[in-house]
Amino acid sequence: KAREGVMEFLLINHPLDCPICDQGGECDLQDQAVAYGVDFSRYREPKRAAEDLDLGPLVETHMTRCISCTRCVRFTTEVAGITQMGQTGRGEDSEITSYLAETLNTELQGNIIDLCPVGALTSKPYAFTARSWELEKTDSIDVMDALGSNIRLDCKGREIMRILPRNNDSVNEEWISDKTRFVFDGLRRQRLDRPYVRRNGQLVPVSWEEALEEAINAIKGKKIASVVGDLVSTESIYALKRLSDGLNGTYECRVDGSCLPVSDRSGYVGNAKISDLDGSDNIILIGTNPKIESPVFNARIRKAWLNGAKIKLIGPNVDLTYEYSCLGSGREDIENLINDKNFILSNKSIIILGQGALADTDGFSVLQAVKKLVETFNCKLLILHVSASRVGAMDIGFTHPEGIDRALDGADVIFNVGMDEFELPKDCVVIYQGSHGDRGAHRADIIFPSACYTEETGIYVNTEGRPQLALRANFAPGDAKENWAIIRALSGKLNCDLGFNSLSELQSQLFDAFPHISKLNEISKSEWLNSDFKGFSSNLPFKVYYENFYKTNPIARASLILNNLSKSKNADNQIRAAE
C-alpha cells in the first residue's frame, strides 16, 4: 500500500507518453507502476510541464517526464567530472537543467541515457527506430580502444541499432565511451561489399575467384610482408601469421613504431590490473592522455582520485577530469625521479605508461627507465594501449625483431589486414583486406572485403592482458567474408596448408600454441624481466598520441554521428570573444 502511494505521487505530473516513448519496454517507472500502481488516476489538477534542454547531438531530452532522481547530475559530476548539470528550484518548481544552457562536454555523456529510469533522457540517433523487444541482443567486446569494454549489440534484421554497456567490475564497470556507443552508424557506411582489382589505374569490381587469382599471381615467387590494424581479432592475426610463415614472409603489428619488447610480456602489458587503480594511493601518468585514449579508463582514475589517490603527470599538459601535479614533460624527468632520494612511492602506487612515450625513436629506453622506476619503488606498471588488437598480436609473436621498417624492407607484396593509419611504400603490390573504403583501400591494388568486429566471432586481449570473447551479432554485407576465412581460402589457392577449416579448429590450434589465450576473462601472470636502462639518446618532450578522439579508425571515420560530434568539439575549442 505504501509503494502504491509513492507511485501515485510519482505519476502525478508524469505524462502519458508510454506509446511514443523510446524508453517503453525497459522503463523502471513503467515496471514499478505495473507492479505497485493503480489503473486510474485521482489527480484532476493541471499537470506540470518543463522546457526541454539542448544537451548536444547525442542526448535527447523530454524534461516533462523527469522525476528528479538526479542520477544524471550525480553521474556528470562524480564520474564524468564536469559540473554542467544541476537541479534548481524547490518543490513542484524544481527541475534538472544545464549550466547556462551549455551542451555536455564529456566523452561519457551517453551513459546518462542508461541511468535515466524514465524517458526523460534518450538517445537522439536511436530515436523512434526500434522497440526494445524487437531487438536481438548479443554480448560482445568493444574495439574502439584497448580497454576491452564489455558491450551488448542490439540488432534488428542485419543492422546494429544500438550499442549498450555490460557490467564488468574488473574492466569497464558499467560505463562505455560515446565513441563506443554511437559508432554503430559507421558500420553501415563506406562498406566494402565486393572484391576489387586495380586495372589501368582504376579499382574495378571482380568475383572472389578473380581476386584470389590476382593475389596468387602477385605473391608467387615474391617477398611478402604482412601488417595488421587495430580492430583485427587474435584468431585472424594468428591465421595470417601461419600463412606468412608458410610463405617465408615477415610480419609486424607495431605499425606506429611503438617500441614494445618482443619477448618481454611484462614490458607490453605490465604487472598491474585495471581494478588495482581502486586501491592505489599514487598514480603516475607518463606520455598519455587517458581522457582521449580511453575515457572509461580515465573515469576509473578519477574514481581513485576521489578516494584519495594523488595523480602525477610526466608529459604535455592536458585537460583531465581531476587535479594532477606535473612532474615534467619528457624523458629526463623519469631519470630524475629514479635518482631523487626525496621522492617516495608506496607499493600501492601505479605507473601508467602510454603510447605517446613508447611510439618514438627511443621508446625502448623510456620503457626500460620506467621499469627501473617500478623496481626502485616496488610499485606496479600498466601499459595503456590504444589498439584493441595489439596485445593479442604481441602475445602470438606477430612482430619483427627490428620493427616495422625492417619488416617492410624489400617486400614485393604487402598483405594489409585492416591497417589504415600508416603510409605503405609505393613500389610494391598491396593486398588490402578490410571492411571499409578508407585509406588502406585507396592505396590497394587488390581488395578483399571482410567483416568488421560485430560480424565475426573473435578474441581480443585488452590492455591489461585479459582475453575476452566477442560474439558475432550480424552478417557482413554483400560478398564480404570473415577475416580468418579469407586467409584460409588464399592459403588453399597457394597450396599452403594451415591445418584448419573452421573457426573452432583455428581456435583449438591457437589455444594449443598459446594456452593463456584460452583462459577467457583471466589475466595470466607475466614474468618480470629486470630493467636494462642505459640512458636516453634524446631529451625531447613526450607527444600527444591522439589529436582527435572521434577519428581514430575507419569505422569511426565513417560514422556521421561521430563526425558531427568531432565538428562540434572543434567548434567548442575555438577561442571566443568575451561577451
Question: What is the role of each PLM region?
Answer:
Residues 4, 31, 128, 170, ...:
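Alpha-helical structural elements
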Residues 1-341, 356, 549-579:
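N-terminal export/assembly segments and adjacent metallocofactor-ligating motifs
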Residues 251, 255-520, 576-579:
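Non-catalytic alpha/beta scaffold blocks inside enzyme catalytic domains
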Residues 505-579:
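Long, low-complexity segments enriched in small/aliphatic residues
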